[in-house]
Amino acid sequence: MVQLTSDCFAFGGKLTRIDEALQAILESLAIKKETEQISLNRALNRFLAEDVIALENVPSDNNSAVDGYSIFFDDLNETGSTALPVIGKAAAGRPLNCIQKRGEAVRIFTGAVMPHGANSEDPDTVLMQEDIQLENEKVIIPPGIKRGSNRRLLGEDIVAGTRVLEAGMRLRPQDIGLAAATGKALLSVRKPLRVAVFSTGDEVTDPGEE
């Protein structure tokens, strides 16, 4: 650019490029990176200040993935049908109130905690209700069932102590749901930046003014 002696650019030095000026301004700013603890229902679109570590396993117990019947796989007849008496019921939030023994079946619903067995041997398989017949309070089970079918294991999705969300990320609805699933009620986020713009001059007016 040619500098004339009678124009406003005639300061006798090198002109600063706009991008260089912006970079110099940004480098001179002292931005305070403050954090705050907020509830999950206020966390959408906020920036996470620290990693989120799972406080508990997901699922928190062995549970059923379907509506059906909890059994011990080793009770099944490999070549023919098996009949087992139904001795109780387990629902989500209402686990079986007794021990499930070998040779027994328990009516179980999706999300219900798997019953406990005797001598540290727990039932390990869930039959879908569509795959069995019910006769005289007994389930008739066809051959061909796989061990461990339709059972979700403790910590199968998330193991307690693992990092599930990384600091610096912008929180989406699914991230907040994940934090809730792992036991978090509050999240540490960056406080929003506060920026002020000053306009000066006698010619400055509010929008709509003449």
Predicted regions span which residues?
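Short, low-complexity N-terminal leaders and the immediately following helix N-cap/first helix
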Residues: M1-A83
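Short, glycine/charged-enriched hinge/interface segments at domain edges or termini
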Residues: V2-G13, S70-E210
